[in-house]
From Swiss-Prot:
Keyword Signal: yes
Membrane-spanning parts: 286-305
First and last residue of the signal peptide: 1-36
PANTHER family: CYTOCHROME F, PTHR33288
The keyword Signal appears for this protein: yes
Stretches of the chain forming a coiled coil according to its record: none
Protein name as it appears in the record: Cytochrome f
Annotated GO MF terms: electron transfer activity; heme binding; iron ion binding
Cell compartments where the protein resides: Plastid, Chloroplast thylakoid membrane
A Pfam match: Apocytochr_F_N
Gene source species: Porphyra purpurea
An annotated GO cellular component: chloroplast thylakoid membrane
GO biological process, one term: photosynthesis
Residues annotated to bind heme: 37, 57, 60-61
Length: 320
């Protein structure tokens, strides 16, 4: 008993440390490293999936990228299973960070499960599944939506595949659950977004000219970034600020047009969504199917034996 109590205490301590490190990562590291934050959606939207089927992460991560989901076709009630979200991207990709420097990409994901499905508790995980999901802090989208799970930001180089341990409901105990085929929706993003929840643009955007005219001077700032001095076609001076880290593709003396791209597109990330289906299978139905197949095979065997017997009788009668 003392050994079990000690193990439980150690597990709780590890969980608490993981939670604390995740919070510190969000508060301290994240603003400079990545905006792959499902937490932004949690703060701004009651549900991450709009009526149109669009997942709200796409409102900030404007580039479209692929995401894959792997889940079993069918599961039994009160069973733990894996759902794998794959977020691929180029190994050599480096993104522009909030301070203008270059860094690796972080990833985040949201999994929208059917009602009744939820994150599997730690005491239901197998040793193998515990090993696969260690150092991952997966949480419900809200206290009222335990079927919606989010994770992120986490380093993308080690987490291109994120395993979600899921517990299926038991219709015998949960009257809201039924043996049925259900959809699972998933969204996954890599890298920083282009728009903050406030509506402001990040520095991870293509910069367009704010006026038509001639570039008189490109002034480099000490803390990074530029000021592009444009003499507009109306002979007025327009000074356009360029955030740190953005690479210009125009030069002094060049004539530009309004809304013309004057920088390279720094974004190497993006968001994608996908879906699959899963069947909550009744054990009684499986037993019934097994019994049906057994009876069918048995009937076939008796039919063949009866046919053989009939053929022998016919052959004997012909000999007489």
């Amino acid at each position: 008993m003392k050994l079990n109590s000690l193990i439980n205490l150690i597990q709780k301590s590890i969980y608490s440390c993981t939670l604390l490190l995740t919070i510190l990562n969000i508060i301290c590291i994240a603003p400079n490293s990545s905006n792959a934050f499902p937490i932004y959606a949690q703060q701004a939207y009651e549900s991450p999936r709009e009526a149109t089927g669009r997942i709200v992460c796409a409102n900030c991560h404007l580039a479209q990228k692929p995401v894959e989901i792997e889940a079993p076709q069918a599961v039994l009630p009160n069973t733990v299973f894996e759902t794998v979200v794959k977020i691929p991207y180029d190994n050599n990709a480096k993104q522009i960070l909030g301070n203008g420097s270059k860094g690796g990409l972080n990833v985040g994901a949201v999994v929208i499960l059917p009602e009744g499905f939820k994150l599997a508790p730690a005491n239901r995980l197998s040793p193998e599944l515990k090993e696969k999901t260690k150092n991952l802090y997966i949480q419900p989208y809200s206290t009222k939506q335990s079927n919606i799970l989010v994770i992120g930001p986490i380093p993308g180089d080690k987490n291109r595949e994120i395993i979600f341990p899921i517990l299926s409901p038991d219709p015998a105990k949960d009257k809201q659950a039924h043996f049925f085929k259900y959809p699972i929706y998933v969204g996954g993003n890599r890298g920083r977004g282009q728009i903050y929840p406030t509506g402001d643009k990040s520095n991870n955007n293509l910069i367009s000219a704010s006026a038509s005219g001639k570039i008189n001077k490109i002034e480099a700032l000490e803390k990074g970034g530029f000021i592009v001095h444009i003499t507009s076609t109306k002979d007025s001076e327009v000074n356009q600020s360029i955030p740190a880290g953005v690479e210009l593709k125009v030069r002094e003396g060049e004539t530009i047009q309004l809304d013309q791209a004057i920088s390279k597109d720094p974004n190497v990330g993006g968001f994608g969504q996908n879906e699959t289906e899963i069947v909550l299978q009744s054990p009684n139905r499986i037993k019934g199917m097994i019994a049906f197949f057994f009876v069918s095979v048995l009937a076939q065997i008796f039919f063949v034996l009866k046919k053989k017997q009939f053929e022998k009788v016919q052959a004997a009668e012909m000999n007489f």
